[in-house]
Regions:
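Outer-membrane beta-barrel porins/channels
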Residues: 78-86
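Solvent-exposed, glycine/polar-rich loop segments of beta-barrel outer-membrane systems
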Residues: 65-78
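A generic structural signal for ordered alpha-helices
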Residues: 8, 12-13, 81-82, 159
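Exposed, low-structure sequence patches enriched in small/polar residues
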Residues: 20-68, 86-274
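Acidic/polar loop-and-plug regions of large Gram-negative outer-membrane beta-barrel proteins
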Residues: 1-25, 29
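Short hydrophobic/aromatic-rich motifs at helix boundaries and adjacent loops
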Residues: 3-7, 72-75, 148-153
Length: 274
């Protein structure tokens, strides 16, 4: 449709499962990144105090007028059984606040050395707790994470690079190692190399999700995802090439758990898995 293919020019001719559903995402963001140079005049050696602040607030809504839909003349319950027969209105709320305070030493020959501590707080929540016969789906995930780390930036002649390492100092075991180098042979030829080793928390919607659809409600406690990644790229007048090799541990994904009967009825059921 977006490519203006004449076969799909009339969008209403495309058959979809949900003809009366809509989704809405609203967000607000405040971002401040500033620094103060301790030494009075810019010189070959400089000392800075850095501060970064980020606040985000998001609201997501999914609305659907009627639960059943039509496909090839058949009535389809696309996401299975629902607590409601009509008027679905599911809402998710999320807010986060991030503060980072750092001290940076800059030398025109050696590069920049930064040491920092940060504070991350988030709240992901719904307006109700769901109680089933054998399980309970909570209404909120709250996180408070403090980390410490360092970063080194180097720019000399045709080389520039950034090396970052941070690790949580609170109960969560989180870490991030990111090393990136770029070589500019000339204005038209650049080569980039990067290595990442990340230990991160699962996305919130894997650990907590609520919906008007019965099968789409869960509360989990998955392990952290671990990612090892090596990549390289080359940009030249003749070719743009890139390479990436990644090893994933405790990878999270949504698994199709629909039964044969549900698939025959065009019902789609997925569940988070690790």
């Amino acid at each position: 449709f977006e490519s203006e293919n004449p076969d799909y020019k009339n969008r209403q001719r495309l058959e979809v499962y949900l003809t009366n559903a809509s989704s809405f995402l609203k967000g607000r963001r405040i971002f401040v990144d500033h620094f103060y140079r301790v030494n009075g005049n810019q010189g070959s050696n400089n000392l800075y105090i850095n501060h970064q602040f980020n606040y985000e607030n998001k609201f997501f809504e999914f609305a659907q007028g009627t639960v059943p839909s039509a496909s090839n003349g058949n009535v389809v319950y696309r996401f299975g059984d629902s607590f409601k027969t009509s008027g679905i209105n599911d809402q998710t709320h999320y807010n986060r606040m991030y503060n980072k305070l750092g001290l940076t030493y800059e030398n025109t020959s050696l590069g920049k050395f930064q040491f920092f501590v940060d504070d991350f707080r988030s709240n992901y929540y719904y307006n109700q707790i769901l109680i089933f016969d054998t399980r309970t789906v909570s209404n909120a995930l709250a996180q408070k994470i403090n980390s410490a780390g360092g970063q080194y930036e180097y720019r000399k002649n045709k080389w520039n690079g950034t090396f970052l390492y941070s690790r949580s100092i609170t109960n969560q075991s989180l870490s991030n190692l990111d090393a990136k180098m770029q070589f500019d042979l000339d204005n038209e030829n650049q080569f980039t190399f990067q290595y990442q080793n990340i230990n991160k928390l699962p996305n919130n919607n894997y650990n907590l999700y609520q919906s008007s659809y019965v099968a789409y409600n869960w509360s989990n406690n998955f392990n952290n995802e671990k990612i090892n990644s090596l990549s390289a790229s080359a940009t030249t007048p003749w070719v743009n090439a890139s390479f990436q090799f990644s090893v994933l541990k405790d990878h999270l994904f949504f698994d199709d758990i629909a039964t044969a009967a549900q698939k025959l009825a065009e019902t789609q059921i997925v569940s988070p898995s690790q």
